[in-house]
Swiss-Prot record:
The lineage of its organism: Archaea, Thermoproteota, Thermoprotei, Desulfurococcales, Desulfurococcaceae. SMART domains: S4 (SM00363). This is Small ribosomal subunit protein eS4. HAMAP family: Ribosomal_eS4. Belongs to the eukaryotic ribosomal protein eS4 family. GO terms for molecular function: rRNA binding; structural constituent of ribosome.
Amino acid sequence: MARVGGGKRHLKRLAAPAFWPIHRKEAVWAVKPRPGPHPIEESIPLLILVRDVLGYAETSREARKLIAEGRIKVDGRVRKDYKFPVGAMDVIEIVGADEYYRMIPYPVKYLVPMRIDAEEAKKKICRIENKVTVKGGHVQLNLHDGRNVLIRVEDPRNPVEAQEYKTLGGLLITVPEQEILDYVPFEEGVIAIVKSGRNVGRVGRIEEIVKGMGRKKTLVKMRDVHDEVFYTVAEYVFPIGKEEPLIKLPEGAWK
């Protein structure tokens, strides 16, 4: 997906990401997401999500009022900024309506809210972008949505507590507490969803990883539920389960 410029405070509708469900010629300007957990080209501002995607408001004024009143939670926390960027795997709660959604990569539409129940809304799967050693010798996992998870180690010279967690692996956590529930390595045999590119939203089992120089040069061979083989790059692969997906998926995406 083409990158949207980040230097200006305003965003013209014609320059907005193609998957935003807004009328391009109805007005000149669109809400520009603030810098946050997801890049502009992979996210949607909270106002557009509430008004144009979920349909909880008819106008910008109504959507901003709902958000300002604390009626919308993202990953278990109230978000009152109508420019807050919402992206892949984020959990949305409509406070008082007992309605929950997970933002899922989806073919053509790129990113859609999928209805989930209250129990499912307590967990979120994230991708490990990198891991670093911090003060005290502990290990910090930096995730795709901007959050950090600290793995405390007893012996910094031999951090066995953090050894299993690798870059590009999937980490199932509770939200908002960030308690680790499960881990899915980026390796052959696991189930993954494609988060971007022409195969966005496709789910399959990883059959082969052909290493290259960097994520965008590493080719991944996958096989979907219809026994069709497709290829993408490691940068777009998001592990979500070993034998079965750890989260609910759209009907027909997997078994």
